[in-house]
Amino acid sequence: DEVANLNSIAKVLLVSLAPEMPGAVEFIEKATASGIRCSAGHSAATHADFNKAKSAGLVHLTHYCNQMSPLHHREIGLVGSGLLDREIKIEIICDTIHLCADMLKTVFKNKETDQMMMITDSLACSWMPDGPGDLGGLPIIVKDGVARLQESGALAGSTLKYAHGLKTVHRLTGKPLSDLVKSTSWNQAQSLGLEGLGKIAPGFTADMVLLDDDFNTCKVFIDGVEKYSA
């Protein structure tokens, strides 16, 4: 009811939840009926839990491989579910830290690009000098570009620039940019039901980032108006 009330005030596009928790499947059904997309994340769900949630309307996996049940030969968990299922879309942090280079290659080899959504999960301290920082009141430390919680040492988010993630995947997989670029905007827009976004074509919002051959940002356009030039 709380989410329904919030959705009536301002449209909710996506909710991340642990599908193994009591009431989660019923929540997914009601949220989906209200036009809210549901994603599994921060979860210890089994493959059976995943299947129940997907039948109820689950469409995403949140920052794939991170904070979710791992792949095991007797229980494939959410990581295995993401590889096995051909419909579920997965969010992926392409920094070779949250997923190592070999895992990135494995995922992009076994999943269709149409089901991939590159994200950064970046912090406010992204691309700042190494040192202390903050994550919602939790102290973090950034060392060699890797952000970790000071207390536990767990990854606290990334310091990834979006274009660098695209560059990393392109060079690791050899996949053409014309294919990979779908995972940077088009897939996300389609999954969230955002019309007129994610493609350079007549009738679409002219929000564009131009990159050079080394993936450095050259120009940024918002609504067709140049807002940045290197």
Annotate each language-model stretch with its function.
Residues F215-F221:
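Short, Lys/Arg- and Gly-enriched loop/turn segments at beta-strand edges
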Residues G77-I92, T96, F108-T120, S126-F204, ...:
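His/Asp/Glu-enriched, well-ordered alpha-helical/loop segment
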Residues D1-S8, D179-V181, S185:
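Alpha-helical scaffold segments that flank or form the walls of functional sites
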